[in-house]
Amino acid sequence: MILPIYVYGHEALRNETDPVQENTEALQELIDNMIETMHNAAGIGLAAPQVGRTERLFVVDLTPMADEIAEAGEPLPPQPMVFINPEIVEESEDTAEMEEGCLSIPEVREAVARPERIRMRYRDREFEEQELEAGGMLSRVLQHERDHLDGVLFTDYLSSFRKRLLRRPLREMVNGEVEADYPLVTKDDETVPSR
């Protein structure tokens, strides 16, 4: 089932998530719905708070970027991937700046500096403990989605100057003046159908 994506300004995006305690049918259904929602929105990552949920969980699918990732010489694990209770246990001192976007902040893209490489510990879809070392685009997407689980958005990393330049489009989102090619939920819990 395709779920509506909560848009910038909704409090659900600023709440910290709760660790997932066990693998249940309801969890598996949520994972299926999140993957379907991500694909419907042509996204490469989606975190539970973006669909109004509090589970410490996100999904990614970098298949659309597989060629670019291969050209960079980075391995790409089988996709899609599920990350339950993820934690970054190591990150490189070296950083890289790259443009990011977010399904919860439609049509806004800005450069963000992040560690180039990370090591993440998490549980997979089968609730098995895993550890993954990632660089390049995979590292960036994992960090971006992991931030959502602590109520952090990529716009939080921007300079005050860049934030001022985004004031109008972000205010429009907060006021519910937003459209996307996928269903949204505004800060007032109003559903905006896909355009």
Swiss-Prot record:
Protein name: Peptide deformylase
Cofactor info, note text: Binds 1 Fe(2+) ion.
Superkingdom field: Bacteria
Lineage: Bacteria, Pseudomonadati, Rhodothermota, Rhodothermia, Rhodothermales
Cofactor dependence: Fe(2+)
Role noted for this protein: Removes the formyl group from the N-terminal Met of newly synthesized proteins. Requires at least a dipeptide for an efficient rate of reaction. N-terminal L-methionine is a prerequisite for activity but the enzyme has broad specificity at other positions.
Keyword Nucleotide-binding: no
UniProt-annotated binding residues for Fe cation: 102, 144, 148
Record's keyword terms, sorted: Hydrolase, Iron, Metal-binding, Protein biosynthesis
InterPro entries listed in its UniProt record: Peptide_deformylase, Peptide_deformylase_sf
Catalysed reactions, semicolon-separated: N-terminal N-formyl-L-methionyl-[peptide] + H2O = N-terminal L-methionyl-[peptide] + formate
UniProt gene name: def
Catalytic machinery residues: 145
Family the UniProt entry places it in: Belongs to the polypeptide deformylase family.
EC nos: 3.5.1.88
SUPFAM superfamilies: Peptide deformylase
GO biological process: co-translational protein modification; translation
Pfam family, one: Pep_deformylase
Uppermost EC category: hydrolase
